Amino acid sequence: MTDHPAIKSNPQWLVRPLATGLCVLLLSACAVGPDYHKPSVTTPVQFKAAEGWRQATPSDAMARGAWWEVYGDSELNALVARLNSSNQTVAQYEAQYRQARALVRSSRGALFPTLDLTAGKTRSSQGSSSTSTSGSSGINDSYNAQLGVSWEADIWGKLRRGLEADTASAQASLADLAAMQLSLQSELVQNYLQLRVLDEQKRLLESTVQAYERSLTMTRNQYQAGISGREAVAQAQTQLKTTQADLIDLTWQRAQFENAIAVLMGMAPAEFNLPATTTIPELPQIPVGIPSQLLERRPDIAAAERSIMAANANIGVAKAAYYPDFTLSLSGGYNSNSFSNWISLPNRFWSVGPQMALTLFDAGRRSAEVDRIEAVYDQTVAQYRQTVLNGFQEVENYMVQLKVYEEEATVRQEALDAARESLRLTSNQYKAGVIGYLDVVNVQTTALSNERSVLNVLQSRLIASVQLIAAMGGGWDARSGLQIKE
C-alpha cells in the first residue's frame, strides 16, 4: 500500500484544521457579559419583635419538612397531602416548571453538534426535440444519501449565557412552585383551624340553647303561677332566639370553610364532607431564626434572586450579538443516477468548511436590546430587595400579632373566669328570690359573650401562627429547594 502523494507533499492539510479547531475551542472558553454576583441587601441582626421568642436551632422540627404537622392533627395532615397531589393551581405551576426545565435541556443541547441524515430518490424529465432520433425518454433518476454534521462554536459565550439564563429561570420557576404550594397549604391550614374553632363555637351555642330552652320553660311556669311577670318570659324568648340565630349563622360559616377546603384539594364541594370533632389543635411553639436565615427559607425571595441571575445572563446574550457567529459544517454521502451502483466509491462526495455570520448594520437594534436587558436587570434587583423587605415586614407583623393575641388571651380568660363567677352568684341569688330573672339574663349574656371571645382570640392566635410559619418559609430551604431534576 502506498501513501497518497498529497499527504506526503503537504502535511499541512491536517495541521491547519487542527490548529484552527484548537483556537476555536480556546476562544470558546470566553463569555461576554458580566459574571453574576448576588445583590447585597441590608439585613438586621435580629427581628425587632424577637425579644422573648425561642430561637430556632438546627434540631428544631420546624426547620425542614411538613410544617403543618406541628399542629398534631392527623386529619389536617391528610388534607394537606391531598392538596399537594391534587390541587389544580399547583398543577399549573408544576407544568410551568416542566416547561422551564425543558428549555434548559434544549439550551444545553445547542452546545453540541447537530447530526443530520437525509436520503431520497428523485425522478426528473427534460423535454426533447421532436426531431430527436436518440430514442431517449428524457426521464432521469437520481439517488442521494447524505450525512451532515454542524456545530456552532460558542466563542463569545452566547449559548452558555443562554443556558445560564434558562437554568436560573427554571430555578425561579421551581421556587415559584414552592411559594404557591406554601401559600395554598397555609390557606388550607387556616381554613381547617377556623372550622375546628367554629365546631367548638357550635357546641357552646348548642349547649347554651338547651340551657336557655330550660330557662324559658321555667320562666313560663313561673309566669303562669303568678311568680314572675310577662317581661321575664319575653326576655327569655329574646335570649333564646338570638342564640339560635347565632347558631344558624355558624352553620353557614362552617359550610364556607368546608367548601374552600374541598376546592383546595381539587374536589367539588359536593364530594367532600368534614365531620365535626371534639378537639381543637393545640397552638404550637414557634421558634424564630435570624433575619439572614429568611433569605434562605422563603421561596419567593429565592425566586426573585434567581430572576436577577437570569437577567444578568441575558445581558451576555444581548452583547454577544455584536460579535460574529461561527459554524463548522461537515457533510458527505453518495449521489448516483443508478440504484445498482449508488453506494460506491466513485459516487461519493464530501464538503467541509467554516461559516461566519456578522451583522454589520442594524440601526441601533442591538444597542437598544442591551439597554432593555440591563433595565430588566435593574428591575429584578429592585424587585428582589423589595421582596426581602416585604418578608421582614411580614415576620415582624406576625410576631407582634402573636404577642398581642397572647396578652389578649390572658385578659379574655380572666374576664371569662369573672363572668362565670358572676353567673354562679347571680343564679344563687335568683334561686333564693333575691333578684329577678332579668338580672340573670344580663349576666348569662355577658358570660356567653366572654366564652365566645375566648374562642375567637384562640382562633386568631392559631391563624397568626400559621401566617408566621408561612412568612418564615414553612419547611422550604433554598439549599435543596432549587435543585433542578433532569
Where do the language-model regions lie?
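Periplasmic alpha-helical coiled-coil/stalk elements that build and connect Gram-negative outer-membrane
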Residues: 159, 175-290, 401, 405, ...
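A short glycine-centered flexible hinge/capping loop motif at secondary-structure junctions
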Residues: 223-227, 430-434, 471-475
